[in-house]
Amino acid sequence: MKDHDVLFRSIRGIAYISVGPLILLTSSLWFTDDKTAYIMAHLAQIYFSVLLFFLCGSIWSFRDYDNCHYKTRITVISLIPLAAAVTGAFFSIFINPAWGILLMLVFTFGIRHLKIINSMISLFDDSYNNLFDKISIILCICLVLILTYWVNPYTYPLEIYN
């Protein structure tokens, strides 16, 4: 087995294991009572923000490699998840959680279409690009489910924030 295969398998395993609790929290929103779901929705958003902070740190650590040409690009790319988590938390605290989740959803979905990110992702193999696409889709689905919980017209959990 080549070193590349082992590296990809370990990165893929880490990615799926780290997204697993978010999937569990998101799906449990719809199977619990309203008071518990309210807490789980906040926990899911906090966990997603923690994932973004870890992503920021992981990308930031790539700056120390020898290639100085990509150092500024990697710095800019590493600040995007940090900005998404901080502004999402700001909107959730000062407006309501639906706006924070919506902002993080737009960041997560829109990130893939930025030119600076596409130019960096094209440097990797197709297997990494496919993994990035799959994890992005999973995260977007989780965020859509959390957003759907917050704007549910039957239980209307946002009435606390009015």
Language model feature labels by segment:
Residues 91-110:
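Transmembrane helix-loop-helix
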Residues 50-55, 104-117:
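Alpha-helical transmembrane segments and their membrane-interface exit regions
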Residues 116-141:
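Interfacial loop-to-transmembrane junctions
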Residues 145-162:
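Juxtamembrane boundary at the C-terminal end of a transmembrane helix
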Residues 9-30, 137-143, 147:
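The first (N-terminal) embedded transmembrane alpha-helix
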Residues 1-2, 42-64, 162:
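Hydrophobic, membrane-facing alpha-helical anchors
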